[in-house]
Amino acid sequence: MSIQECPESPMLEGEEGRGVERDSDRDSAVDSASEISDGGRTGEKEEGIGICLPREKGDLMHNHFEISDQSALSSASLNEEQFEDYGEGEDGDCTTSSPCPDDEIRINGCSDLGSSVSSSAGQTPRKIHNVDDQMEVFCSQCCKRVSLLSDLENRLKNLKTSSPNRKISSTAFGRKLLHNSNISSSNGSTEDLFHDSTDSSDLDITEKVSYLDKKVTELENEILMSGDVKTKLKQENIQLVHRIHELEEQLKDQETRAEKIMEDELRRHRDAYIRLEKDKNTQIELLRNRLHQLEDENGKMAMNMNRLKSQTEKLDEEKQRMTDKLEDTSLRLKDEMDLYKKMMDKLRQNRQEFQRERDTMQELIEDLRRELEHLQLYKLEAERAGRGRRSSISLSEYSSRTRESELEQEVRRLKQDNQKLREQNEDLNGQLLSLSLHEAKNLFATQTKAQSLAMEIDHASRDQLLEALKQQEEINLRLRQYMDKIILSILDHNPSILEIKN
C-alpha cells in the first residue's frame, strides 16, 4: 500500500464531510454487526469487515468525486441492501463473484487516506507536511495489522466450514447504520476527522486484532470440542442404532418364538382336550356297562336270596339234628372225660412206677454186665491155672448160669409190663378223642347265637344276611374238617368206638 496509488483530485469540503460521514456510518454499522453476531460466523464477518475498514473509505471518497449528493444517497442505499443480503444470506463471507465492497477495498488499498490528504492539500497547504508524516506512520502500522488480519482471515476461512451459520437481521443492521451516520454527520472539520480517524483506527485495529485472536482461539476450541462431541455423538448414535437393530432382531426372534410356543401350547392343549374327551367317553361307556352289570347282578342276587332262604331253612333243620347229636355226644364226652381223668392219673402213676422199675433194671443190667466181665476174666485165669482147678470153675459156672436164668425171667416180666403200658396208652388215646369231641360240642355251643335262623332272616337286612351266611358257611366248613379229622384219628387208633351197638 502507498499513497501514490490513490488518485489526487480536488474535493469539496462538503463532499469530504459526506464521505467521512458515510465512512463513519459504515464503521458504526460494522461495530454494531460485530456486537450483535456471535459464534464462528460473527468472527468471520468481523474479520472481513475489519480488513475492509481502511479501504472502504477510499472507495467511498473516490465515488464521491464522480457522483452527486443524490448519487451518494443511492450508493448508500445499495450498500445497505448489500449489508441486508449479507445478514440474510446462507454464507457469511463475501465471495469473489458477489458485488461486495471488500473486493474494491482490497484493490484500492489505502486510497482513502491519499484522497483525504490530496483533497485537504488544495485548501490547507500548510498542513501537508504533517499529514504526510502521519500517513507514513499510519501506513506502516496498517501494513502490520493488515497482514495480521489477513492471517486471522485465513485461519477463519479454514474454520469457516465447521463454524455455525448465524444470520443478522437486515432491519436492525440498517437502523444501526442510519443511527451511526446521523451521529457521524455532526462531527467537526476534515482535519479533526482525520486525526480522530487515525487514532480511532489504531485503537480499533488493536482491539479488533485482540478480539479476533480471542475469537479465533475460542472458535478453534469450540470447533475441537464440537468435533469431539460430534464424534462421540456419532459413535453413540452408531452404537444406539446397532443396539436398536439388535433389539429389533431380538424382538422379532422373541415374537417368532412366542408364536411358536403359543402354537405348541394350543396344539398341546387341543390334544389334551381331545384325549380328555376320549377318556370321558370311555369312562361313561364303562360306567354304563358297569351299571348294566350291577343290575344283572342285583337280579341274580335276588334270585340267590330266595334260594339261600330255602337253604338256610334246611340248614336250620340240619343244625337242630346236629345239636341233638352234639348233646348226646357231649354227655358221653363228659363221662369219657371223667374216665380220662382217672386214666390219666393211673397212667401218671404207671409211668412213675415204670420209670422206677426201668431205673432198677438199668442198675441190675449194669451189675450183671460187671459180673459177666468179672466171670469172663475169672474164666480166662482159670484156664491158665490148669486142669487142677476144674472143680472150682464148675461151681462158678453153675452160679453164673443160675444168675442168667433169673435175669431172663426178669426181662420177660418187664416185656409183659411194657405191653400192658402200651395198651393203657391206646386207651388214653381213645379218651383224648372223646375229649376232642367235647371240644367240638363247646364250639357248636359258642357259635349258636339264636334259636331260629329263619326269624333272623325275616327281620335282618341283605348285608346282615350275607354276613351271617358267610359266617355260617365258615363254621360248617370248620366243623366238617374237624369231624373228618376225628373220624380219621379214630379209624387209625381205635375203630371199635365207631361200632354201632344194639
UniProtKB/Swiss-Prot annotation:
In what way does this protein cross or attach to the membrane? Answer: Peripheral membrane protein
InterPro entries xrefs: FIP-RBD_C_sf, Rab-bd_FIP-RBD, Rab11-interacting_regulator
* SUPFAM superfamilies reported in the protein's UniProt record: Eferin C-derminal domain-like (SSF144270)
GO terms for MF: protein homodimerization activity; small GTPase binding
| Matches recorded under PROSITE patterns | FIP_RBD
Ranges for domain FIP-RBD: 439-501
Stretches with biased composition (Polar residues): 71-80
What the protein does?
Acts as a regulator of endocytic traffic by participating in membrane delivery. Required for the abscission step in cytokinesis, possibly by acting as an 'address tag' delivering recycling endosome membranes to the cleavage furrow during late cytokinesis.
> What PANTHER family does UniProt report for this protein, alphabetically?
RAB11 FAMILY-INTERACTING PROTEIN 4, RAB11-FAMILY INTERACTING PROTEIN
Name it.
Rab11 family-interacting protein 4B
Native species of this protein? Danio rerio
